[in-house]
Amino acid sequence: MLILISPAKTLDYQSPLATERYTQPELLDHSQQLIREARKLSAPQIGKLMSISDKLADLNATRFHDWQPDFTPKNARQAILAFKGDVYTGLQAEEFSEADFDFAQQHLRMLSGLYGVLRPLDLMQPYRLEMGIRLENAKGKDLYQFWGDIITEKLNDALKAQGDNIVINLASDEYYRSVKPKKLNAEIIKPVFLDEKKGKFKVISFYAKKARGLMSRYIIENRLTKPEQLTAFNSEGYFFDGDASEKGELVFKRHEQ
């Protein structure tokens, strides 16, 4: 079973590390190509491209400039401990045991605009480059064209290594678009999280993102290997709705808090 999640814009390079172990990202040659393109942009151009403030544009221009391909614990941090968004609030990797990190390293992948695919313990230097950004490059007009089949091939390698063919898609649509489902040697299962509001169940972005992290944590902590085991997920009040689910899509609901 391979879990896919999105990265986060918010980063943490300060808090204590839950593990000293680390690995190197596997697609750094490609990352370097993107860094070369990003360095051509001025801070105002970055601000316009990413729709961010002048302050954030300056920060990310500096990050692109400072980025170097030799990753060490001094200039980089394990990806699963560096990302700090809603998904990662649910995941709570800072509480993982070494055995949890072992399982996650094999079964969890973070999709990334700059790094393509990251394993949890892969070192990562700080960056902001969302998958949907239209950064022109040698391969085309955006990052989807840049990555092409590369991300899908890397995921197929991971599935082959674990002798499995189940992908749990907990990534956002923006990031999952970088995967080619028809070329993925897997059965793809997408959990959907609906929260009740005024008597109706719907996707509420903040809650859904956190729930993707909660589900990832549930799989990792319980060492799940079969998709049917996901239906027992009940973190923070969610419950499986078999009637609303269909092939390839598992629906979880939660009553209004």
From Swiss-Prot:
Pfam families, alphabetized: H2O2_YaaD
Alphabetical GO biological process terms: response to hydroperoxide
TM ranges: none
Superkingdom of origin organism: Bacteria
Protein known as: UPF0246 protein Ent638_0568
Family under the similarity heading: Belongs to the UPF0246 family.
HAMAP family associated with the record: UPF0246
InterPro entries: YaaA
CC per GO annotation: cytosol
